[in-house]
């Protein structure tokens, strides 16, 4: 694997993001909603670097392609944090790729009528975007590479424990085995929290 972002580079950029977020929310308590699984390390390091009071929540959003009666449908399964009405909310995710998941979660969060809601991502891949959504706080903007490490897992969740971000070996990219074997087609698991 080739290292794309070192541990030191990630830490430096996260501290910069935390300073900017802390300045924007000075004097206020911030409800941080971290998207699992990919966002957990970025979220943990980010909230530890913030200088404002933080209430931390977690949401797991899983997007699945379903083939029903010849039609393909996407569903997102998620659990939800409580009582965000009138609060300042920061949604934290590792990667803003197509924007489908983040757009869905932002709309769901807006239904709880927070005072403000913003998005922070470690990586932005604008070339992959399917929806018009932008993060207010972005660590790095990059091409649509497939990465592992620092919370980002390859197929079967491998390499999440790496302290850096690397380009994934082609054989470990999500979906590589599925395309070859067709193993995971038609299986959908709903996560309830």
PLM regions and their residue ranges:
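PRPP-associated nucleotide enzymes
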Residues: 1-193
């Amino acid at each position: 694997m080739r290292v794309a972002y070192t541990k030191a580079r990630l830490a430096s950029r996260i501290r910069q993001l935390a300073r900017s977020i802390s300045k924007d929310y000075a004097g206020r308590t911030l409800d941080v909603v971290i998207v699992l699984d990919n966002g957990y390390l970025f979220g943990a390091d980010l909230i530890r670097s913030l200088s404002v009071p933080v209430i931390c929540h977690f949401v797991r959003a899983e997007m699945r392609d379903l083939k029903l009666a010849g039609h393909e449908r996407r569903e997102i399964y998620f659990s939800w944090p409580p009582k965000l009405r009138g609060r300042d909310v920061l949604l934290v995710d590792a990667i803003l790729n197509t924007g489908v998941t983040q757009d869905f979660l932002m709309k769901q969060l807006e239904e709880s009528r927070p005072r403000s809601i913003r998005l922070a991502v470690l990586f932005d891949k604008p070339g992959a975007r399917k929806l018009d959504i932008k993060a207010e706080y972005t660590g790095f903007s990059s091409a649509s590479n497939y990465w592992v490490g620092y919370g980002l897992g390859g197929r079967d969740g491998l390499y999440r424990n790496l302290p850096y971000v690397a380009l994934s070996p082609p054989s470990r990219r999500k979906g590589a085995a599925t395309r070859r074997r067709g193993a995971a087609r038609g299986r959908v698991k709903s996560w309830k929290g």
